[in-house]
């Protein structure tokens, strides 16, 4: 928590929640670019939105069980689709036009996909469009924080390897410091989505939150439909 508070320029108590921490992170990021942030509005969460994909378990005893983890899934999807409140164009397509299920079954009308390809935009599985001509502040922050995490995780692994070779006790402090920093970066990355879907957040937007979750559903479900030596069973 102390590492996150120092890095985000926030009070210690602010990192125990999600919205205040990310509000200040975004403020400092935009201030460097001379961009004025919008006024905070009182917003009520009146609608529900699709969450993460949860596969129904296959009850029984199984051999050769495996698991997989998509590296920083939501942060990478934010970067991939350029998902950000100010890059959101709107949602011209409804569930009958596009959804995770329709994309998996190739049931989206060709004229919709052809039209998207002609424009400089991305289309998320909830039918939302995001502009690509300018990078959003959320993808920019995701990229910066992710790159920092990769850097400090590499330094931690290098310090661990050096300690194995030399047994120098001083390296333990380096290992602990680098691990602490990279873990703080990881928590920061994964908490951004939670802020977007929180109605107390300055940049709260259900379309943006759902764009992230449905894109995650699509990525995970594609693993089950991709050709492989053995069908994935869960």
What are these regions, as identified by a protein language model?
Residues 149, 189, 220:
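Conserved hydrophobic/aromatic pocket- or pore-lining residues that grip, position, or stack substrates
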Residues 224-229:
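Conserved small/polar residues in nucleotide/adenosyl-binding loops
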Residues 145-159, 185:
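Non-transmembrane amphipathic alpha-helical segments
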Residues 217-223:
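Short amphipathic alpha-helix segments
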Residues 97-143, 150:
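Conserved catalytic alpha/beta cores of large enzymes that bind or transform nucleotide phosphates
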Residues 1-85, 91, 170-217:
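Common nucleic-acid-contacting/processivity interface regions adjacent to the catalytic cores
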